[in-house]
Amino acid sequence: MEHKLEMVTKRIDALLEAKELVLVAIDGPCTSGKTTLANALAQRYDCNVFHMDDFFLRPEQRTQERFAQVGGNVDYERFSEAVLRPLQAGEAFSYCPFDCATFTLAQPVAVAPKKLNIIEGTYCNHPYFGTPYDLKVF
């Protein structure tokens, strides 16, 4: 893990020197260390961290057709509108994370713009989002 962390931090450092806004995606299968890596990076950098687990489908969105899609358990539309677009615009915003205990949206979380933004979770690199990321870690 330490070697991977050092490789990623070198890439992030270079991006931070070259760009005003940096978006990093950490994707991979369940229990592969995505959240652990994001947390380690958050200890090193002043950054925002977003979790795809906060964007599961609400009950009314859970259809056979949706679940038949690759990654169909993720609310791509809400993540794109509520988080990705404001991030790319450098705007302050808020979003409501999905609460897995109640299957509802929780209270809004306010987000201030930061130069470095990390999105972690399975399907954060889904083709639906296009190519918004400066660095993709898998």
Where are these regions (language model features)?
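Hydrophobic positions on the alpha1 helix immediately C-terminal to the Walker A/P-loop
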Residues: L37
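Conserved lysine of the Walker
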Residues: K34
